[in-house]
Design a protein with these regions (language model features):
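N-terminal leader/propeptide and maturation segments of large enzyme subunits in energy/redox metabolism
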Residues: 62-81, 247, 254-296, 484-587
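A cross-kingdom feature strongest in bacterial/archaeal respiratory oxidoreductases
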Residues: 1-41, 101, 173-175, 180-226, ...
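Short coil/turn segments at secondary-structure boundaries
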Residues: 97-107, 135-141, 257-264, 301-303, ...
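Conserved active-site and cofactor/substrate-binding residues in soluble primary-metabolism enzymes
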Residues: 48, 77, 81, 116, ...
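Generic, well-ordered alpha-helical scaffold segments in large soluble proteins
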Residues: 85, 89-96, 124-132, 178, ...
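N-terminal export/assembly segments and adjacent metallocofactor-ligating motifs
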Residues: 1-254, 295, 588, 597, ...
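Acidic catalytic cores of enzymes that act on phosphate-bearing nucleotides/polynucleotides
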Residues: 309-402
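Conserved short loop/turn motifs at secondary-structure junctions
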Residues: 105-113, 287-291, 316-324, 355-356, ...
Length: 667
């Protein structure tokens, strides 16, 4: 039988689905991709997995209020019965408790396609129905998202708007990579990509003679071909190392005093902190050695090398996914400011290298495809990481970004396309919190832990069972995603599910805007095309794009250098901070009066690290880097436990310890 071919896209890259007799039999990587991810090989098994949800199902014991343990039986029902139950429950909660009793943030990565992007659709549906409690921030770079605007006036450098790799290759001589440059992490980007270029750019940088230093607990966080100097560091101590480097620059008069004076505010208070003038603790290399495990002489030499040439300081997202995660990013900015390279080609700081595909890749700044999101009439939100706190402690107050809020009393959770039982912290606590709502509704394609802990489960199609348009703001391609097979079982796409619910609740036209699936595919592409036109880039019409399967943006005419305009003229191009400068000391943060985030970068010992009292009983830290062959859901077997030799290793692990690792809390 003839094999049919359909262009498509996943978060780990573009591909062509190969279909025979209605079944996906393989995935052929996109021809333009120099380094396609081998995770594409798993797609046929995922689509045809025995864990697929075949039909709508309702949990036994839901109406009686029995606990959600993840082990109850589900009874399959018709789509009409399931949709009627969902619509009735939404109406009941809205009428009885108000829209702020519904949690609808639905954080998750279900689709690289933007029309069927589940989180966008569930929020659009709930916002148009009166609103809900939304989620803000993210698990990827949430600390940076709210710190960086206080320090440099924008969080865009955290999501990839940083000095281009092309500028680095031409001008940088030394890259200090805190958290390393793990190529395996470059397999994935939200929204997918036409090319995986991280290895390409690293090889170009190496060929250009750039020296690399990888500062990470794992040597494997930098590829062998870089020949990077490895500086093994105790986990969660990067801030102390950066402060000691800053102290070396200051005490040896190697820092750029003129840059600091013109482009920064608050240096004097930070200088006093570095020198220990107020606490009698100089933050020098000897001090940092005791914390980081990096020799004092090595710390001083790193600082001297960075000051002697054009240097780029880059930090992986992992640094700020930890207790006091604001501090290493703030310290990196201040260290880069003292080196004086901010705003110069190949100099300054960057975030996200080694964390995701597309970071720093030269690209015309054209908007990516997305479905429009209306305002949330409920005007209510929580930080994503506080979900369990909210469910367990309704009406309690909490502090966030300098303001005091109260947790809403959630009666209904609506989750589409995500799996919080994978990515939330302290899963045992989350399971307790998950018992609090009266109803949990989930859309998913597989029986994930979240689906098994739901009351009403609606089976959603996978990417290959619907049409879509995908692409990332970090990539130069916009890609057509053709439906390759019929929906499996009774699955429906999220758009059609929400359209049917909106019809039952009286706002179908507002939700669809009289567009069907293909109408929305054309609409989101046309928005990209209009954005490209405004930047002087001509793209073909939708029909040609759909037939050819992709369009590619041309490369930019010149390299992008972060804060280049600001450096050239800080008066005409001030930063969006209160001072218009880089805020080494933030009066706004000082005004928050947070014990765990002072007004300037500082060393704050984490709750868990090798220097804490608990390390006397638990001397072996657990590192949980992203897996090499799977993304962020549940597909794939549990990875083996690596035991790294160390002078701190005092006894072999007991089997009971290894068993407990499976239930450990992850930061």
């Amino acid at each position: 039988m003839t094999v049919a071919r359909f262009p498509s896209l996943a978060h780990w890259g573009a591909f062509t689905a190969l279909v025979e007799n209605g079944r996906v039999i393989g995935c052929e990587p996109f021809a333009r991709d120099p380094a396609p991810s081998n995770m594409l090989e798993a797609i046929p098994d995922m689509v045809h997995s025995p864990l697929r949800i075949a039909r709508p199902a309702i949990r036994e014991g839901w109406r009686e209020g029995k606990a959600r343990t993840g082990t109850e039986r589900f009874h399959e029902v018709s789509w009409d019965e399931a949709l009627d139950a969902v619509a009735a429950e939404l109406a009941r909660v809205r009428e009885t408790f108000g829209n702020t009793a519904i949690l609808g943030g639905s954080y998750g990565w279900s689709s690289a396609g933007r029309v069927h992007h589940a989180r966008s659709l569930v929020r659009r549906f709930l916002f148009l129905g009166g609103g809900c409690v939304d989620q803000v921030g993210n698990y990827s770079f949430g600390a940076a998202q709210y710190l960086l605007p206080r320090v440099i006036g924008t969080f865009q450098p955290a999501v990839g708007q940083i000095t281009d790799w092309s500028s680095i290759v031409k001008h940088t001589r030394l890259v200090l990579a805190f958290g390393g440059l793990a190529i395996k992490n470059g397999q994935v980007t939200s929204g997918g990509a036409g090319t995986h270029s991280m290895e390409t750019w690293l090889r170009r940088a190496k060929d250009a003679g750039i020296e690399f230093v990888s500062i990470s607990p794992l040597k494997s966080d930098a590829p062998d071909f870089l020949g990077a100097q490895w500086v093994p560091i105790r986990p969660n101590t990067d801030t102390a190392l950066m402060l000691a480097m800053a102290h070396t620059l200051l005490s040896e008069e190697r820092y750029d005093a003129s840059f600091v004076a013109r482009y920064c505010t608050g240096f004097e208070a930070f200088r006093r902190y570095l020198l220990g003038l107020d606490d009698n603790v100089p933050k020098d290399a000897q001090w940092a050695e005791a914390i980081t495990g990096v020799a004092a002489d090595a710390i001083r030499e790193l600082a001297r090398r960075a000051a002697a040439t054009r240097s780029m300081i880059t930090c992986a997202w992992s640094l700020q996914r930890a207790h006091h995660g604001e501090q290493p990013y703030w310290a990196a900015i201040v260290l880069a400011a003292m080196l004086g390279g901010i705003g110069l080609p190949g100099g300054g700081f960057a975030f996200g290298h080694g964390s995701s595909n597309g970071i720093g890749v030269p690209r015309v700044d054209v908007a990516g495809p997305e479905v429009p999101l209306p305002l949330n009439p409920a005007r209510s939100m929580i930080p994503v990481a506080r979900m369990a706190d909210m469910l367990l402690h309704p009406d309690d107050s909490y502090e966030f970004n300098g303001r005091r809020y109260s947790y809403p009393d959630i009666r209904l959770v609506y989750w589409a396309g995500g799996n919080p039982f994978h990515h939330h912290q302290d899963l045992n606590r989350l399971q307790r919190a998950w018992q609090k709502p009266e109803t949990v509704i989930v859309h998913d394609s597989w029986w994930t832990p979240t689906a098994r802990h739901a009351d009403i489960v609606l089976p959603a199609t996978t990417t290959l069972e619907r049409n879509d348009v995908g692409g990332s703001s970090r990539d130069s391609f916009v890609l057509a995603m053709h439906r390759a097979i019929d929906p499996i079982g009774g699955a429906r796409n999220d758009f059609d599910i929400f359209r049917a619910l909106a019809r039952r609740l009286g706002y179908e036209t507002a939700f669809t805007e009289d567009r069907d699936e293909m109408g929305w595919c054309q609409w989101v592409y046309d928005q990209v095309r209009a954005s490209a036109t405004a930047k002087g880039v001509a793209l073909p019409g939708f029909q040609q794009f759909w037939a050819e399967g992709f369009v590619e943006m041309p490369p930019p005419e010149r390299d992008y250098v972060l804060f280049e305009d600001f450096r050239r003229d800080p008066e005409r191009h001030p930063l969006k901070t209160p001072s218009g400068r880089i805020e080494i000391v933030s009066d706004a943060v000082a005004g928050f009066d947070y014990a765990d985030c002072p007004s300037h970068p500082a060393w704050l010992p984490p709750a868990e690290w090798l220097g804490s009292a608990s390390a006397q009983h638990w001397p072996t830290p657990a590192r949980l880097p992203a897996a090499t062959r799977r993304s962020r859901r549940c597909s794939g077997k549990t990875a083996s436990l690596w035991l790294i030799p160390s002078t701190r290793w005092s006894r072999p692990p007991r089997s009971s310890i290894l068993r407990r690792c499976r239930r450990a809390t992850a930061w």
